[in-house]
């Protein structure tokens, strides 16, 4: 994720719809999209320099020829009232800060989780093992629940856990699993406790909570549920782009996607004398799904919301949106008060508040159950 900033980009951006773009073959280059239709070929170091300046982007180098970003999304009717309070509250009661502390301590102990590094592969393998253990513990595999690796052409794989429902229409919760030290991406220490170890373990704990409901475990929910952990977000939303492009190509229907990127830092709000709140992202999201998310928060969470904007391609919900799937994003705080330690070796567990992370987990359980059950 990013700290929002406005940049004056000096290099000429080229329209996707324009003439062919020459590639400098003297060094590996990547095609990035900085805004709708504005692209540029850059080296990997130039990508990191943009990120250091607060500029996010899609890396569309491997995008299918002829791909067109969605300009409209199907009209989906979302619930306008809470229908499953008893079930959700029972699941929420099982959520554990201790589980999240244990998981995040381990996840942030990898030297880094860079998507091209062996550490990124190792951390993804460990994380998938925890997801599999949650499914096994709930007995959900007997009813078709599973977790699979979504492979890419780099070391770290994405992870997709599926709990089948009566309909193939999918309710998705996602978080990116990779981390980065922007000064030294491949070898630098990048614990990534908040960005985005916090989101990764938050949705893992929410998965455990959801798997306490036997209607869901036994495949009797109305819709299918998926939990995603994306590889390569920091390099241009690579893993989530690959997954949602695949879903688009294969005709999968997604009812809604909720993204969780950074869920644990509250000091910025506290230092400003503000009430600790969720940051509701209002740009590059689906307005109707976001309205539904607000309703879920008001029912199941104990903190209020603040509207905030995070810019183009700021996190993985943008990949769903780009492929025509409705998405929403809830951050730990307003964007201008996010954790200042992100992308450094100082992004450690010491700065995080697990009560705040539990609030995010409560949101996820409510979102999934009210939309899928």
Swiss-Prot record:
What S-S linkages are listed for this chain? 310-314
Q: One GO CC annotation, please?
A: extracellular region
Record's subcellular location? Secreted
Q: Which keywords describe this protein according to UniProt?
A: Aminopeptidase, Disulfide bond, Glycoprotein, Hydrolase, Metal-binding, Protease, Secreted, Signal, Virulence, Zinc
CDD domains for this protein: M28_AAP
Relate the protein's function as given in its record. Extracellular aminopeptidase which contributes to pathogenicity.
Q: Where does Zn(2+) 1 bind?
A: 176, 195, 261
The cofactor note from the UniProt entry for this protein is: Binds 2 Zn(2+) ions per subunit.
Where does the record locate the signal sequence feature?
Answer: 1-18
Top enzyme class: hydrolase
Which species is this record about?
Arthroderma benhamiae (strain ATCC MYA-4681 / CBS 112371)
The protein's matches in Pfam families, at most eight in alphabetical order, are given as:
Peptidase_M28
Q: Which cofactor does it need?
A: Zn(2+)
Q: What is this protein called?
A: Probable leucine aminopeptidase 1
Give the enzyme's EC designation: 3.4.11.-
